[in-house]
């Protein structure tokens, strides 16, 4: 949730935070209006009287779609069901955001001139049947995962194995971006993991626990994925 941060806790129930998050998105839309690049931003989004943990896809000042998180962890250090509503409980297939009526759903596919991609959020990857499996069957060649994945003993290696296997299973590229040093450390610690996989193989990774902003860049060979 790059706009608000993931560790806001009960502030996710505050109208002021939700309104300011939408105002921040409007500023980003205005600032990127002349850019062709597609951006995926994590933020809380109000749907009727509920709040979803969502990925918002934007390009050239327009919102292309909103993808709600499907599986909300509610165990150990996580209690997301206290604040958010699962995609499984949202019946609407569109939402009004920043004055635009945009598609919404955990099954959305986004097409570019070069490829088709889908999105899942954090815990979705850890589910028995991740949304990315269905997205790949529908034609997604690249999966993006916006995450707030905290650290634990042995967890990083497990995460890398999980992404590698899912990328190979889906025969896809998999781009994973997680929260870093800007999050609160009251309950947990975030390493800022950035990982790019292609069909099970690691292509690029960020430096863990870096105290500065990072950018990792790598090409994903979609022709190889299609072969």
Which residue stretches match the model-derived regions?
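Enzyme catalytic cores with a strong preference for nitrogen-chemistry domains
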Residues: 1-227
């Amino acid at each position: 949730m790059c706009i608000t941060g993931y560790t806001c806790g009960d502030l996710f129930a505050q109208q002021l935070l939700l309104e300011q998050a939408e105002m921040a998105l409007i500023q980003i839309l205005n600032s990127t209006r002349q850019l062709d690049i597609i951006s995926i931003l994590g933020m809380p989004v109000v749907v009727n009287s509920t709040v979803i943990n969502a990925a918002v896809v934007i390009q050239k000042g327009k919102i292309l779609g909103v993808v709600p998180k499907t599986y909300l962890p509610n165990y150990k250090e996580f209690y997301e069901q206290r604040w958010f509503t699962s995609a499984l409980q949202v019946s609407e297939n569109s939402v009004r955001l920043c004055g635009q009526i945009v598609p919404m759903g955990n099954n959305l596919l986004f097409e570019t001139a070069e490829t088709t991609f889908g999105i899942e959020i954090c815990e979705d990857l850890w589910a028995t049947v991740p949304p990315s499996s269905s997205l790949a069957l529908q034609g997604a060649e690249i999966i993006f995962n916006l995450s707030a994945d905290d650290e634990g003993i042995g967890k990083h290696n497990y995460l890398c194995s999980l992404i590698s296997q899912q990328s190979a299973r889906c025969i896809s590229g998999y781009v994973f971006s997680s929260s870093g040093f800007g999050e609160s450390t009251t309950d947990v610690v975030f390493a800022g993991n950035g990982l790019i996989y292609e069909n099970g193989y690691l292509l690029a990774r960020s430096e863990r626990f870096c105290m500065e902003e990072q950018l990792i860049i790598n090409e994903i060979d979609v022709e190889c994925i299609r072969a």
